[in-house]
């Protein structure tokens, strides 16, 4: 009998699903929401190895953990929140946002928590996936420790930042003090008065150090190579801004669009080396460092990279240099020789610590690790990727049928929010999944996998473009690329370009098999669409139109108060300059950078 994919998976069909999604983080939730709102498919399961939704935001609990992208853009386009506490959300607030979204869209009934996928194997005869699942929960394991789940389509939503990377340093297992990885934080440990060694100076380290420095007796940061760092300029969002964002929806739209325009403009800064904007940002980074460390000129050269900005992840922080300026915080750039029983030994020094923090990132280029995946003919994903991970637009893999990835190879960004990429991928994959499910409902079969020659041509084009970007700078080694220099993680262009290229599924790019393949092949292409967030008008038009609407609502609500509003001296496509009287302040002209935030600040000044 034909299968009904509109029914939820219940007790009687616990081991069968039309779709299985691995991971309940940003990607997995987005995929599930698209299935709910873009297809009639309800027979799907989300397997989450943790005990909550949120993915990396549920796992990274370290002090100071926060997003590097503004909240208006680092959130789903279809779930814009008007009451973020600050421009850059912290881990706890973003996790709350994720749980709220999961609750609103009814995702919890589809999620199986504490479920670790060990292996996924394609059955050529049955044309289905067989997924081996192990249960982490002690209570669940009383019923069964593991089981096998069959599905017609498998989606990996495990992302790139899910498996911690532990450094290969001799003696790490000999250390007798407290050892914590930044992605596996232990809040039961008391950090007050402790001597702490922090290995690493990347995105997590610069957020951890300022927090630990508040109570630690001494901190030493072990730096392998310097990073480009810019100020975060984080601002709390006040009640009046919340009011405006809540009751003037076009203002939320304007703010997100302007952030999108600014972030896309950053592509020329962070990805294209040698441009005037890139050199200006490098100069700004050095100016910021020197202004924050005026009494430590001996650190200026040590903290200045010799590679193009953007080659490694650009760091943003308002308080890292302030922490580094403290008398009880040191920077050590000598290579670590080994970890001793009591601390860290370099070539000419040994320091004892109560705690060593491993801020050493993730195994980002080892996609799906440690899950064992076997595609058509039993061919392993490890074998398919022996020359490096590659996937068609980061989503589909040769010889791996009815399989899709979210945030897969070459879809990470150095300049914008990855959620914008994930939403485009989720739309694309939901179209493919719908085709497979429709065939199944008609008691037919449909097997989809990318043509090897299409994938090869695509990958060559991507790598050729990447070779011209800052990511390829030989002077730096980053998690964007393998030890051999192959860039496996990053997309070489803008978000808008990616969205346009995946706005339709071109069926000729795929090998279609099964009794339902002919009907799909006849379609040539299926339009997916995209979220259009690049403004079709100038910043000036956006400013004036939304300001008029916001001003009207705001004035009606607060006209009985006395306000001193600064005079706007200049408004243009390149930014704003404003200031007058007691509340005067002037911003640098920056192309669309914080135009919406600037407007909100004008409208949010306190009473005179």
From Swiss-Prot:
Keywords: FAD, Flavoprotein, Glycoprotein, Membrane, NADP, Oxidoreductase, Transmembrane, Transmembrane helix. It is an enzyme of class 1 (oxidoreductase). GO terms for cellular component: membrane. It is a multi-pass membrane protein. Its EC number is 1.14.13.-. Belongs to the FAD-binding monooxygenase family. Non-reducing polyketide synthase; part of the gene cluster that mediates the biosynthesis of the bicoumarin kotanin. The non-reducing polyketide synthase ktnS first catalyzes the formation of the pentaketidic 4,7-dihydroxy-5-methylcoumarin from acetyl coenzyme A and 4 malonyl coenzyme A molecules. Further O-methylation by ktnB leads to the formation of 7-demethylsiderin. Then, an oxidative phenol coupling catalyzed by the cytochrome P450 monooxygenase ktnC forms the 8,8'-dimer P-orlandin via dimerization the monomeric precursor, 7-demethylsiderin. This is FAD-binding monooxygenase ktnD. It comes from Aspergillus niger (strain ATCC MYA-4892 / CBS 513.88 / FGSC A1513).
């Amino acid at each position: 009998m034909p299968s009904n994919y509109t029914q939820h998976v219940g007790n009687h069909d616990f081991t069968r699903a039309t779709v299985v999604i691995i991971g309940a983080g940003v990607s997995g939730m987005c995929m599930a929401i698209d299935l709910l709102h873009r297809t009639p498919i309800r027979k799907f399961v989300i397997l989450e190895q943790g005990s909550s939704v949120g993915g990396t935001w549920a796992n990274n609990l370290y002090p100071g953990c926060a997003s590097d992208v503004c909240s208006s853009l680092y959130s789903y386009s279809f779930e814009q929140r008007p009451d973020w506490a600050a421009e850059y959300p912290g881990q706890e607030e973003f996790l709350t946002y994720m749980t709220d979204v999961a609750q609103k869209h009814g995702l919890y009934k589809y999620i199986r928590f504490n479920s670790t996928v060990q292996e996924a194997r394609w059955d050529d005869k049955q044309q289905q996936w067989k997924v081996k699942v192990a249960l982490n929960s002690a209570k669940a394991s009383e019923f069964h420790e593991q089981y096998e789940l069959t599905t017609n389509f498998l989606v990996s939503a495990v992302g790139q930042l899910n498996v911690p990377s532990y450094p290969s340093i001799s003696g790490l297992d000999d250390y007798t003090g407290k050892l914590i990885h930044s992605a596996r934080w232990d809040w039961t440990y008391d950090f007050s008065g402790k001597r702490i060694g922090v290995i690493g100076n990347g995105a997590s380290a610069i957020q951890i150090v300022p927090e630990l420095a508040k109570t630690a007796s001494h901190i030493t940061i072990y730096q392998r190579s310097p990073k480009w760092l810019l100020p975060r300029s984080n601002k709390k969002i006040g009640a009046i801004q919340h009011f405006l964002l809540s009751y003037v929806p076009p203002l939320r739209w304007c703010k997100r669009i302007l952030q999108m325009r600014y972030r896309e403009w950053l592509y020329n800064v962070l990805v294209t080396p040698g441009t005037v904007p890139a050199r200006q940002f490098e100069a700004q980074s050095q100016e910021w460092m020197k202004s924050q460390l005026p009494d430590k000129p001996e650190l200026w050269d040590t903290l200045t990279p010799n590679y193009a900005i953007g080659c490694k992840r650009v760091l943003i922080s308002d308080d890292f240099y302030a922490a580094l300026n403290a008398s009880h915080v040191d920077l050590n750039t000598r290579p670590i020789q080994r970890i001793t029983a009591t601390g860290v030994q370099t070539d000419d020094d040994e320091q004892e610590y109560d705690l060593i923090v491993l801020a050493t990132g993730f195994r980002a280029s080892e996609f799906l690790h440690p899950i064992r995946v076997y595609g058509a003919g039993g061919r392993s994903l490890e074998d398919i990727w022996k020359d490096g991970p590659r996937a068609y637009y980061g989503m589909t893999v040769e010889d791996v049928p009815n399989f899709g990835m979210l945030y897969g190879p070459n879809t990470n960004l150095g300049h914008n929010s990855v959620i914008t990429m994930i939403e485009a991928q989720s739309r694309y994959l939901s179209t493919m999944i719908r085709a497979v499910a429709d065939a199944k409902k008609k008691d037919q079969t449909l097997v989809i996998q990318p043509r090897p020659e299409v994938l090869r041509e695509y990958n060559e084009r991507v790598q050729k473009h990447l070779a011209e970007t800052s990511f390829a700078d030989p002077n730096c080694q980053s998690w964007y690329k393998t030890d051999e220099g192959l860039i496996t993680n990053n997309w070489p262009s803008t978000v808008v370009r990616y969205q346009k290229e995946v706005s339709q599924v071109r069926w000729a790019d795929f090998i279609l098999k099964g009794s339902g393949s002919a009907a799909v092949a006849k379609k040539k292409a299926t339009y997916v669409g995209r979220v259009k967030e690049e403004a079709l008008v100038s910043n000036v038009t956006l400013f004036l139109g939304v300001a008029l609407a916001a001003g009207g609502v705001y004035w009606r609500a607060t006209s009985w108060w006395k306000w001193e509003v600064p005079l706007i001296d200049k408004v243009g496509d390149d930014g704003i300059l404003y200031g007058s009287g007691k509340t005067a302040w002037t911003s640098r002209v920056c192309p669309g950078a914080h135009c919406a935030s600037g407007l909100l600040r004008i409208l949010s000044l306190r009473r005179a």
